[in-house]
Swiss-Prot record:
<dbReference type="InterPro" id="IPR011812">
    <property type="entry name" value="Pep_trsgly"/>
</dbReference>
<keyword id="KW-0997">Cell inner membrane</keyword>
<protein>
    <recommendedName>
        <fullName>Biosynthetic peptidoglycan transglycosylase</fullName>
        <ecNumber>2.4.99.28</ecNumber>
    </recommendedName>
</protein>
<keyword id="KW-0328">Glycosyltransferase</keyword>
<dbReference type="Pfam" id="PF00912">
    <property type="entry name" value="Transgly"/>
</dbReference>
<dbReference type="GO" id="GO:0071555">
    <property type="term" value="P:cell wall organization"/>
</dbReference>
<comment type="similarity">
    <text>Belongs to the glycosyltransferase 51 family.</text>
</comment>
<comment type="pathway">
    <text>Cell wall biogenesis; peptidoglycan biosynthesis.</text>
</comment>
<dbReference type="InterPro" id="IPR023346">
    <property type="entry name" value="Lysozyme-like_dom_sf"/>
</dbReference>
<dbReference type="GO" id="GO:0008955">
    <property type="term" value="F:peptidoglycan glycosyltransferase activity"/>
</dbReference>
<dbReference type="InterPro" id="IPR001264">
    <property type="entry name" value="Glyco_trans_51"/>
</dbReference>
<keyword id="KW-0812">Transmembrane</keyword>
<dbReference type="GO" id="GO:0008360">
    <property type="term" value="P:regulation of cell shape"/>
</dbReference>
<dbReference type="InterPro" id="IPR036950">
    <property type="entry name" value="PBP_transglycosylase"/>
</dbReference>
<keyword id="KW-0808">Transferase</keyword>
<feature type="transmembrane region" description="Helical">
    <location>
        <begin position="8"/>
        <end position="28"/>
    </location>
</feature>
<dbReference type="GO" id="GO:0005886">
    <property type="term" value="C:plasma membrane"/>
</dbReference>
Amino acid sequence: MFRIVKWLIALPVGIFIFFNAYVYGNIITYRAVAPHRTAFMSMRMKQFEQEGRDVALDYRWVPYNRISVNLKKALIASEDARFAGHGGFDWGGIQNAIRRNRNSGKVKAGGSTISQQLAKNLFLNESRSYIRKGEEAAITAMMEAVTDKDRIFELYLNSIEWHYGVFGAEAASRYFYQIPAAKLSKQQAAKLTARVPAPLYYADHPKSKRLRNKTNIVLRRMGSAELPESDTD
């Protein structure tokens, strides 16, 4: 009986250690090499296949300096205003999310920073639980410890979902505006950013009033967005 209990404890611990060793190895690799495909991309494409949708993956990596500063500012203004200064976690946002989750009785709000969103996109699935949030936090901490802010942001910009099968700034820019990501205007960047929280909803509801309102909010906030110190755009 004791041996069974020991195995029941050792097995999940071993899986946790193995998975995090795998993740850490990939984080080190991604400091210099672009991901071939993220876990979220794979999950989403499998979902489309199961739903019978004929969707092809459109994912085009471009370096950080070939992405418009307008899009960088728009995303920081909308998704993580403290990105340049925090260590991966916005503690005020996390406390607010915990409060909202407690009031609703389930995990709905995440309080996720850009770094946390990237951790999820690269390695995790879409499930909402405190266990997954804990794993997301562990990955975020590892990533922030060994990766500079520009690279984290570069990975994020290239892995965001924007439409059915459309991932990353370059693919989105060409899909919506037929231009490279480097040439996005403020208005275009704000419109793209407004889609980020619910890209598939807005793909099906492109004339949503909520999308227009969010675009205007992003435009107003862009001027105060603080980019990482090493940004030279």
